[in-house]
Amino acid sequence: MKIKTILTLVAALTVVTASRAFAHNPGGKPDPMNASLESLKGAEFEQSFLQQMIQHHRSGIEMAKLASNQTKRPGVRDFASKMISSQQEEIAKMSRWLKSWYNASPKEVANPAANKEMKMHMSMLNGKRDADFDKVFLTMMPEHHHAAVEMCEQAEKKATHSELKEFAAKMAKDQQDEMRQMKDWAQSWFGPA
């Protein structure tokens, strides 16, 4: 009886651990940007967060730009256009903070591992058209947003500038709203995942 109880507890713990890992990143593997931020705090955290979120937004913009030519759905095109506009505004704001708070400029590549992952995502989207594009885009972009939401959650806890905390909270909410929209479209057009 004791062994059965222990095995049940081990199985339950395994399920909880696996589900937390999956919730951490829906793709199942750790996000390189979030992992690199976890041990940082104070000014070092803020600089790294800003640098990496700028890189993250740039990669999201590149993915969204593909939608203007590769989907037939006006809703996806409009969604991508709005996303590009809002993320360009956020990049400008984060770049100003980097300059005024830390006398730094955005790096072209703040996280090489994330850059490599983005190139893989772009290769999966390139060449896809219409429904094939939409299906991949509506799978990958929510995962991309999920990583940004997790980065924002860290910033809400660890940032030292209150305006960065507020900015991160708003960005997380906006990206969660966009994730819901994309998941609704994916389910409506392609069925349950």
Language-model features: locations:
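Bacterial N-terminal signal peptides that target proteins for export
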Residues: 1-8
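Bacterial N-terminal signal peptides
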Residues: 8-16
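Sec/Tat signal peptide C-region and signal peptidase I cleavage site
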Residues: 17-23
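All-alpha RGS (Regulator of G-protein Signaling) helical domain and cognate RGS-like helical scaffolds
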Residues: 24-193
